[in-house]
């Protein structure tokens, strides 16, 4: 869903990318800073129950996912290393978000069920990325699916924010169910996406 908005978002990031390049900041540095920042914010904020603050801080660093590629294009660099680094570090950022949520439910959230569901959402999210990466290593394409990385990030961070605001009284208390509902959706959507991509690869292999 959100993949269709990447081109427009890249234009928004252009001025920031230009400013960083003028400051002699490299795309790789932006990638590392973004990943380390997102991981730290997710693993510090979410386990502590800082659910309405955490998503804003994580999102701030996730912006680098658009910036590094934008900067590389402006420099005329389309290196395999840059693509590999970006894709690899993205997995750490994604894992940190769901690990942070699992730790929240294992601590302040006090729910074994939702701790397990957060772990399941993490596993299926990683599986969707692995299936695509493996397919591409075989010169095949597996970008299909109802839950891309951008979709997973949006759903998870918005749900965490809503639950956090409900916990502090900014939203009606029943809105605390937003995060559990999102975990159910992400687990199911992740499983479906894995199947969709496996089917796509199977068909490509047989064609």
Swiss-Prot record:
What reactions does this protein catalyze? Answer: a CDP-1,2-diacyl-sn-glycerol + 1D-myo-inositol 3-phosphate = a 1,2-diacyl-sn-glycero-3-phospho-(1D-myo-inositol-3-phosphate) + CMP + H(+); 1,2-di-(9Z-octadecenoyl)-sn-glycero-3-cytidine-5'-diphosphate + 1D-myo-inositol 3-phosphate = 1,2-di-(9Z-octadecenoyl)-sn-glycero-3-phospho-(1D-myo-inositol-3-phosphate) + CMP + H(+)
Keywords (alphabetical) are:
Cell membrane, Lipid biosynthesis, Lipid metabolism, Magnesium, Membrane, Metal-binding, Phospholipid biosynthesis, Phospholipid metabolism, Transferase, Transmembrane, Transmembrane helix
The cross-references to Gene3D superfamilies, in alphabetical order and at most eight, read: 1.20.120.1760
List positions binding Mg(2+) 1.
65, 68, 86
Required cofactors, per record?
Mg(2+)
Cofactor descriptive note: Contains a di-nuclear catalytic Mg(2+) center.
Q: Which InterPro entries match?
A: CDP-OH_P_trans, CDP-OH_PTrfase_TM_dom, CDP_ALCOHOL_P_TRANSF_CS, PIP_synthase_PgsA1
Look at the named UniProt entry and state the broad enzyme category this protein falls under.
transferase
Q: Which family does it belong to?
A: Belongs to the CDP-alcohol phosphatidyltransferase class-I family.
- HAMAP family assigned to the protein according to its UniProt record, in alphabetical order: PIP_synthase
Identification of the protein by name = Phosphatidylinositol phosphate synthase
Q: Which organism is it from?
A: Cutibacterium acnes (strain DSM 16379 / KPA171202) (Propionibacterium acnes)
Which taxonomic lineage does the organism of this UniProt entry have?
Bacteria, Bacillati, Actinomycetota, Actinomycetes, Propionibacteriales
């Amino acid at each position: 869903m959100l993949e269709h908005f990447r081109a427009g978002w890249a234009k928004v990031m252009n001025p920031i990318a230009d400013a960083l390049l003028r400051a002699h900041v490299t795309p790789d540095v932006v990638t590392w800073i973004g990943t380390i920042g997102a991981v730290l914010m997710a693993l510090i904020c979410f386990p502590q129950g800082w659910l309405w603050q955490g998503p804003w801080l994580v999102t701030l660093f996730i912006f680098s996912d658009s910036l590094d590629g934008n900067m590389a294009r402006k420099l005329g660099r389309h290196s395999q290393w840059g693509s590999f680094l970006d894709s690899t570090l993205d997995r750490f950022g994604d894992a940190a978000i769901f690990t942070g949520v699992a730790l929240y439910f294992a601590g302040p959230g006090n729910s074994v069920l939702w701790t397990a569901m957060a772990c399941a959402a993490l596993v299926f999210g990683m599986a969707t990325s692995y299936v695509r990466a493996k397919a591409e290593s075989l010169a095949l394409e597996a970008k299909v699916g109802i839950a891309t990385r951008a979709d997973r990030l949006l759903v998870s961070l918005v749900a965490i924010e809503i639950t956090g605001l409900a916990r502090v009284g900014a939203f009606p208390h029943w809105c605390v169910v937003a995060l559990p509902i999102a975990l159910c959706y992400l687990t199911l959507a992740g499983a479906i996406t894995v199947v969709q991509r496996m089917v796509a690869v199977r068909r490509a292999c047989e064609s």
